[in-house]
Design a protein with these regions (language model features):
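Non-catalytic terminal/accessory segments
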Residues: 1-163
Length: 163
């Protein structure tokens, strides 16, 4: 199919030509030139690396919103964890290797949805700013780590959250 097929210039440190088409999407990843650090020499160079695509990011956020966590204020946190952990584990296994900061932003977005759930569930949080609720979630993550992304080290920020 000619609409889908395109030739892309794989820009790197060794090839410095300028072309209009240097990125492409494949299997939910966007391949594009980016700064990379060599493992042994610790030198920075331009490499062609995969990142999670904007299309995939949009779909994942839509899926997270479709869970309607805020309206499930009657549901305990461990039941929510049982519901979403297999999905979070799958996303982390697929996108986590090359997702980088864009995947971390998705996990922070999920933490923000959990904070909105807590605000709806507990009356004491209704007048508090979001960072107080995120600190509470961070304390739960330190104690229990019931969500998969908490278990692998992406715990809620105990301060302000940037999206």
């Amino acid at each position: 199919n000619e609409e889908k097929t395109k030739i892309v210039y794989c820009k790197s440190s060794r090839r410095k030509e300028n072309h209009s088409n240097v990125t492409f999407d494949f299997l939910g990843h966007t391949f594009r030139p980016c700064k990379t650090i060599h493992k042994s020499s610790r030198e920075a160079f331009t490499g062609f690396q995969p990142r999670i695509s904007m299309k995939s990011t949009t779909k994942i956020r839509a899926t997270m919103r479709s869970w309607n966590l805020k309206s499930k204020s009657h549901t305990p946190l461990d039941c929510i964890a049982q519901m979403v952990n297999p999905i979070l584990r799958g996303w982390a296994n697929y996108y986590g290797k090359y997702g980088g900061k864009s995947f971390q932003k998705l996990l922070r977005y999920f933490d923000l949805l959990l904070a909105k759930w807590a605000k709806a569930k507990y009356k004491t949080f209704r007048r508090n700013p979001m960072y107080v609720i995120l600190k509470w979630l961070g304390n739960i993550a330190d104690r229990d780590a019931i969500f998969y992304h908490w278990q692998i080290g992406f715990k809620p920020a105990k301060g302000t959250i940037k999206l």
